[in-house]
Amino acid sequence: MIDKAKNVSQPKDYKLIVEKDVKIPLRDGAILYADIFRPDGGAERFPAIMNIGPYQKDRLWIPPDDLEEKANPHLAWETANPVWWCARGYACVRVDSRGSGKSPGLSDPSSYQEAVDFYDAIEWTAKLPWCSGSIGTLGVSYHANCQWRVANLQPPSLKAIIPWEGRADLYRDQT
């Protein structure tokens, strides 16, 4: 079994396409801004891994030298590493929450509105021509908590969540 599994996530020779500051329209007329990182696969369609958060999608994070993950110009705090994921056939979509980073509006962290915005961003992404229609979410801490909230709304295109180090019980974990 292990011999078969070792080749599952091996990188391919995809080139990386980077789209910065892409506008995502929301149901209430507001917009969010996202950075999209995707494999250059011609007509091939890819699933997307998304996150939303207030930590500025453009803010570069450099990991310590002793981590397996190596620095690259596309890393951001507690989000998916697009260099790693895109090489394996996934797109990464990093969204600034309303009122944070480049997204205009009033910031309301951990709110129902943020979950609705994430729902809209997921469904918008699923309809893009390069997307297979399948969306997963990934992130650590705050980005993990956002996944629980949007999953509760059951966006049709959301197929998986990967919440790392987030709260499982908001009341118990925060009070």
Q: What are these model-derived regions, one by one?
A:
Residues 70-73, 113, 138, 145-175:
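A catalytic-pocket lid/entrance helix-loop region that shapes and gates access to the active site
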Residues 35-90, 95-98, 109, 152:
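N-terminal cap/lid subdomain of alpha/beta-hydrolase-fold enzymes
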Residues 129-142:
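Alpha/beta-hydrolase fold nucleophile elbow
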Residues 76-77, 109-129:
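Alpha/beta-hydrolase active-site loop
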Residues 5-44, 48:
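N-terminal cap/lid segment of alpha/beta-hydrolase-fold proteins
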Residues 31, 45-48, 88-91, 131-134, ...:
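Loop/turn elements at helix/coil->beta-strand transitions in domains of secreted/extracellular proteins
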Residues 19-21, 132, 145:
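Short coil/loop residues immediately preceding or within conserved phosphate-binding loops
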